[in-house]
């Protein structure tokens, strides 16, 4: 599929094309900050456009976003880059609803509209707790929050109480990415037996993550133990730790059993992998809840973006369930890793049932989040139109 090319002038032309639409044509707008955004939007967009027959606008900062060439006639797509055109888009936005998975609205350069009462909806891009993985106040300026589970509701309500904030609309939504993965599992699982020894390594972003701490040693141990290895660093790691990435490339890219993934893990590889090794990456919960399978957690310090997270009394979900959905391994005992991986299938049924139970208590509307979210958006539009 050939994707369009854009110059700076064409980015502004795209913005003008969006702004030329009638308000009714841009009643529902989605904004994608990066390639991962569509993982969290897809099922909701499909429900709105294909099931409810509603028109939406899809505005993206991703130059090669496949949605720019979507054949769906209910979607109008626009590329606005990530510079001054994007800043103006937010400042002068006229739309009924804007759906985003980007936190920190109105905290830095991404502002609420100064000219129109847009209703802002936030979709989480992780199941982790609000007060531990986001900056303080990251979602304060949204009108509605699509909550993954009861932990988000409890955390947001306590945050509002502690800081005297205006109550937000909280929708018992779920996690669209998990729904997509569970649906994909029916088609992909056990379709490629050549990948049965594939190990996914998914470090989080920031100082002291597993890649920085022990990544090279870990990859070396796994490859020497005849495992296939896919390393998928956080996308910001390629920018901020370029020297480390170069070292890894030079050392391992000649090995046919090693893959360095720069984007989203391809579904076929994700669903045919043997296990995941992570530290504090949100994808670890996605993996555990999709396959009802233990994750191996390397015990490195957790990055806390919110230095005042202890103002909220609730233990973060990623800490409280960590030892129940996975095995925690010290970076000083990596030699145990191959045997630990081979032993993961022991007590398989018991672990499966335990993780299923945790999933049911942690995530709302498993398999149905898009229906819940689309109904809320439809009702909101109907309310706006009746006023």
Model-derived features with residue positions:
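Catalytic binding pocket for nucleotide-activated donors in carbohydrate/polymer assembly enzymes
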Residues: 139, 167, 282-361
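A nucleotide-sugar donor-handling region in carbohydrate enzymes
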Residues: 2-13, 138-211, 235-238, 352
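Active-site and donor-binding regions of nucleotide-sugar-utilizing enzymes
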Residues: 29-182
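Conserved catalytic-core segment of nucleotide-activated headgroup transferases in glycan assembly
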Residues: 39-53, 170, 176-249, 331-334, ...
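C-terminal alpha-helical cap of glycosyltransferases
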Residues: 366-387
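Short acidic-hydrophobic, aromatic-tinged amphipathic segments that line or gate anion-handling sites
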Residues: 77-83, 258-262, 325-333
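Donor nucleotide-activated moiety binding/catalytic core segment of transferases
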Residues: 82-86, 242-285
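Membrane-proximal basic amphipathic "stem/tether" segments
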Residues: 1-27, 34
């Amino acid at each position: 599929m050939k994707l369009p090319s854009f110059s700076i002038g064409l980015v502004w032309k795209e913005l003008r094309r969006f702004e030329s639409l009638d308000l009714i044509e841009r009643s529902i707008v989605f904004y994608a900050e990066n390639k991962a955004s569509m993982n969290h939007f897809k099922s909701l967009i499909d429900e709105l456009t294909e099931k409810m027959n509603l028109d939406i606008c899809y505005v993206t900062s991703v130059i090669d976003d496949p949605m720019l060439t979507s054949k769906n006639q209910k979607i109008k797509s626009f590329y606005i880059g990530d510079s001054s055109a994007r800043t103006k888009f937010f400042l002068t936005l006229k739309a009924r609803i804007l759906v985003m998975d980007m936190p920190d609205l109105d905290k830095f350069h991404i502002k609420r509209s100064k000219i129109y009462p847009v209703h802002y909806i936030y979709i989480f891009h992780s199941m982790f707790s609000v007060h531990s993985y986001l900056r303080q106040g990251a979602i304060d300026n949204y009108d509605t929050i699509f909550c993954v589970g009861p932990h988000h509701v409890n955390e947001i309500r306590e945050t509002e109480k502690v800081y005297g904030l205006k109550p937000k609309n909280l929708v018992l939504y779920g996690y669209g990415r998990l729904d997509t993965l569970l649906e994909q599992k029916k088609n992909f699982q056990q379709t490629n037996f050549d990948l049965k020894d594939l190990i996914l390594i998914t470090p989080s972003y920031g100082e002291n993550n597993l890649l920085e701490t022990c990544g090279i040693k870990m990859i070396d141990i796994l490859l020497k133990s005849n495992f296939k290895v896919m390393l998928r660093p956080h996308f910001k790691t390629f920018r901020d730790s370029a020297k480390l990435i170069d070292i890894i490339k030079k050392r391992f890219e000649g090995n046919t059993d090693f893959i360095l993934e720069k984007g989203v893990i391809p579904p076929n590889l994700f669903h045919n992998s043997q296990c995941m090794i992570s530290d504090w990456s949100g994808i670890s919960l996605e993996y555990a809840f999709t396959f009802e399978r233990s994750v191996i957690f390397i015990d490195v310090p957790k990055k806390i973006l919110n230095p005042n997270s202890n103002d909220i009394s609730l233990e973060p979900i990623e800490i409280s369930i960590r030892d129940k959905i996975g095995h925690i391994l010290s970076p000083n005992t990596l030699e145990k890793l191959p045997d630990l991986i081979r032993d993961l299938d022991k007590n398989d049924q018991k672990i499966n049932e335990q993780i299923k139970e945790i999933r049911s208590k942690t995530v709302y509307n498993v398999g149905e989040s898009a229906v819940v979210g689309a109904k809320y958006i439809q009702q909101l539009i109907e309310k706006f139109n009746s006023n």
